[in-house]
């Protein structure tokens, strides 16, 4: 196994570290400062109408309800004017967000593919080690049969030598898998 941790497709989401709600609200307030002003005027008119209603002043109540309607109209105009004025900037922001999303998806996909490749390579390494150990175990079992029959032993030894040489090349010329297993089990150098 490698020392470094494998990348995972379940890593932390970087969207969390970008604009949070307060930053977005601050940006919107800077972009369209008249909208919150209209909302505040509407709320103030409703509050004054409520107080006038509690006091029983119907003239002031009607005046405040009219003020509320004017404040709401002002708010709607501010929203419409702001949307027309900032339309190109919002389109650019949407395109930038789409590009960033595509980049994030591509990075996540690349990390996922790299993770799969690493795991596949580890599986192949494990299978090759397992096959090598299995071949070494079979080689130990076959050897007593070779020693029993003298005429066949010479033919088998000649046919096994190329196989041993090819096995030596795979293992880096260390004397073969069989000798490595013998060294491990009998403690010789």
UniProtKB/Swiss-Prot annotation:
Keywords: Coiled coil, Membrane, Mitochondrion, Transmembrane, Transmembrane helix. Residues 86-122 form a coiled coil. The chain crosses the membrane at residues 33-49, 64-86. Residues 6-97 form the HIG1 domain. Its main location: mitochondrion. GO terms for biological process: mitochondrial respirasome assembly. It is a multi-pass membrane protein. It is found in: Mitochondrion membrane. GO terms for cellular component: mitochondrial membrane. Residues 142-189 are annotated as: Disordered. Residues 154-172 have a biased composition (Basic and acidic residues). Associates with the respiratory chain complex III/complex IV supercomplex. Cytochrome c oxidase subunit which plays a role in assembly of respiratory supercomplexes. Belongs to the RCF1 family. This is Respiratory supercomplex factor 1, mitochondrial. It comes from Trichophyton verrucosum (strain HKI 0517). The gene is RCF1.
């Amino acid at each position: 196994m490698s020392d470094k941790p494998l990348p995972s497709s379940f890593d932390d989401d970087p969207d969390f570290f970008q604009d949070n709600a307060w930053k977005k609200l601050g940006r919107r307030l800077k972009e369209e400062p008249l909208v919150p002003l209209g909302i505040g005027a509407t709320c103030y008119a409703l509050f004054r109408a409520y107080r006038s209603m509690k006091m029983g002043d119907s003239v002031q109540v009607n005046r405040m309800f009219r003020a509320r309607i004017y404040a709401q109209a002002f708010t709607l105009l501010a929203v419409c004017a702001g949307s027309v004025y900032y339309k190109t900037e919002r389109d650019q922001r949407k395109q930038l967000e789409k590009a960033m999303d595509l980049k994030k998806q591509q990075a996540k996909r690349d990390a996922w593919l790299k993770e799969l490749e690493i795991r596949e390579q580890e599986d192949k390494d494990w299978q090759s080690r397992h096959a090598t150990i299995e071949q070494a175990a079979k080689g130990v079992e076959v050897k007593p049969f070779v020693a029993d029959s003298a005429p066949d032993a010479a033919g088998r030894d000649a046919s096994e030598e190329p196989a041993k040489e090819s096995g030596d090349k795979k293992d880096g010329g260390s004397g073969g898998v069989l000798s490595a297993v013998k060294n491990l089990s009998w403690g010789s150098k």
